[in-house]
Amino acid sequence: MSQPPKILLLYAHPEPQDSVANRVLLQPAQQLANVTVHDLYAHYPDFFIDIHHEQQLLREHQIIVFQHPFYTYSCPALLKEWLDRVLSRGFANGIGGNALAGKYWRSVITTGEPEDAYHADGNNRYPMDDLLRPFELTAAMCRMHWMRPMIVYWARRLQPDVLSSQARAYGEWLSSPLPEEER
């Protein structure tokens, strides 16, 4: 049996102390040897990102997980800055920019609204797949494989047993994220 692939979990929450759901989701990840949890707000409170360090982390991992709350149909500001600065031309895209080609991208997102708010007749007027399209396109621009996102809807209002169940499922996926033939 082969080793599980190395996973870089980029965690971006500007107020982690207030996030019950993300704290619970991170617990299984922090126990796994194949997962590097990288808290962007803890590392870069001033938003001055060490681009070379971040690019080296990306080179060292096969799967990149972006875990964050869904803010204004996107991600928190520091993660957006990270995407714009770290996934640069010549590294992740453009001529010679193939450092991430063939790697995997998975978004793990918590929302403040129920799942039925994300459809044509819902509060947000679009399904979540449509709202996540910019992330999917960014993965494609970097020649990465887009993996089905994990969405935790109405995160603050979930019953503890439901949230624990989702965290267990997340931990199981992190333990074995790819079929054997893709490792």
Swiss-Prot record:
Keyword Transferase: no
Predominant place of localization: membrane
Keywords: Cell inner membrane, Cell membrane, Membrane, NAD, Oxidoreductase
GO molecular function: electron transfer activity; FMN binding; NADH:ubiquinone reductase (non-electrogenic) activity; NADPH dehydrogenase (quinone) activity
Reaction(s) the record says it catalyses: a quinone + NADH + H(+) = a quinol + NAD(+); a quinone + NADPH + H(+) = a quinol + NADP(+)
InterPro entries in UniProt: Flavodoxin_fold (IPR003680), Flavoprotein-like_sf (IPR029039), K_H_efflux_KefG (IPR023947), KefG/KefF (IPR046980)
One GO location term (cellular component): plasma membrane
GO biological process: positive regulation of potassium ion transmembrane transport; potassium ion transport
Membrane topology: Peripheral membrane protein
SUPFAM superfamilies: Flavoproteins
EC code: 1.6.5.2
Subcellular location as annotated: Cell inner membrane
Pfam families xref list: Flavodoxin_2
Quaternary structure (record): Interacts with KefB.
HAMAP family named in the record: K_H_efflux_KefG
Family under the similarity heading: Belongs to the NAD(P)H dehydrogenase (quinone) family. KefG subfamily.
Function: Regulatory subunit of a potassium efflux system that confers protection against electrophiles. Required for full activity of KefB.
Name by which UniProt lists this protein: Glutathione-regulated potassium-efflux system ancillary protein KefG
Origin species: Pectobacterium atrosepticum (strain SCRI 1043 / ATCC BAA-672)
